[in-house]
């Protein structure tokens, strides 16, 4: 497919992406896009991603990892493409339920909390491993209680809603 056709197809096929989200969600995506678009040119490129990772404390991101992220897009990543990519990833998924289910695998008794040391071990040794800095940031933002437990239900609520449960 020629670049012109691909661009036309992308523009035509993505116009309904705005109907997939509520206005508040679109605004949140726009804020995220603006934060990631470090050079303010209206597109997210490799340098923007590297700068975003650095701002989040991940300074040793491999070029291959960034290349893979860029390759997920059908072309230059403007806001519409960014929104379309998230729409495809989130289609049909309730983020709160998805994250809760991931934690529930480690909580067969359904208590709603896990030992912080166990969470630390799992996040640094399994699948998409967190760095020590990422773990430290998480526990700084969501400290365990006095008995060393992490209230993952509240953590998930804050991640997905941006505020604590009443």
From Swiss-Prot:
N-terminus is methylated by METTL11A/NTM1. SUPFAM superfamilies: EF-hand. Ca(2+) binds at residues 37, 39, 41, 48. GO terms for biological process: cardiac muscle contraction; cardiac myofibril assembly; cell growth involved in cardiac muscle cell development; heart contraction; heart development; heart morphogenesis; muscle cell development; muscle cell fate specification. It is found in: Cytoplasm, Myofibril, Sarcomere, A band. Abundantly expressed in both cardiac and slow skeletal muscle (soleus), with no detectable expression in fast skeletal muscle (vastus lateralis) or non-muscle tissue. It comes from the Eukaryota. One of its GO terms (cellular component) is myosin complex. One of its GO terms (molecular function) is actin monomer binding. Its main location: cytoplasm. The modification Phosphothreonine is found at residue 52. Pfam families: EF-hand_7 (PF13499). The modification N,N,N-trimethylserine is found at residue 2. Contractile protein that plays a role in heart development and function. Following phosphorylation, plays a role in cross-bridge cycling kinetics and cardiac muscle contraction by increasing myosin lever arm stiffness and promoting myosin head diffusion; as a consequence of the increase in maximum contraction force and calcium sensitivity of contraction force. Myosin is a hexamer of 2 heavy chains and 4 light chains. Interacts with MYOC. This chain binds calcium. This is Myosin regulatory light chain 2, ventricular/cardiac muscle isoform. It comes from Rattus norvegicus (Rat). The lineage of its organism: Eukaryota, Metazoa, Chordata, Craniata, Vertebrata.
